[in-house]
């Protein structure tokens, strides 16, 4: 289950709003993620993503961010200050399978960087910022959502 699916389900269970940060970025910039990346490059996109995520002001919401949000220290500190950061941990093989259309998905890759390189670069950052880590290689939906709804 991906971040958006998990986020929508959790939001419904908790009676919260669901916010897709990628959609917020697209709305604020008036462009698709891949268009932003094409225009300003990966570093420029990360700056935009950091700015937008640092300014999110929501209550009783589940926020699904893009994977590159972990490069923005200000965004991650802001997200941690307004809620609990959950890392949906996936083995590389599963991530590779899910991201078959990597360019169309707006994945931030530097020139010459492979998906494996990106994975190995980001995992320590996800682990650093996570308050909770959920291993997504096993489906826990039936176990975790009822427990979470009591929080």
Task: Specify the residue positions occupied by each region the protein language model found.
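Conserved small/polar residues in nucleotide/adenosyl-binding loops
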Residues: 141-147
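A glycine- and Lys/Arg-enriched "phosphate-lid" helix/loop adjacent to the NTP-binding pocket
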Residues: 82-123
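Post-Walker A helix-loop "phosphate-sensing" segment adjacent to the P-loop in P-loop NTPases
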Residues: 13-21
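Walker A/P-loop
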Residues: 4
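Phosphate-binding beta-loop-alpha motif at adenosine-nucleotide cofactor sites
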Residues: 129-140
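ATP-dependent small-molecule kinase phosphotransfer cores
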Residues: 23-69, 73-77
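ATP-binding Walker
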Residues: 1
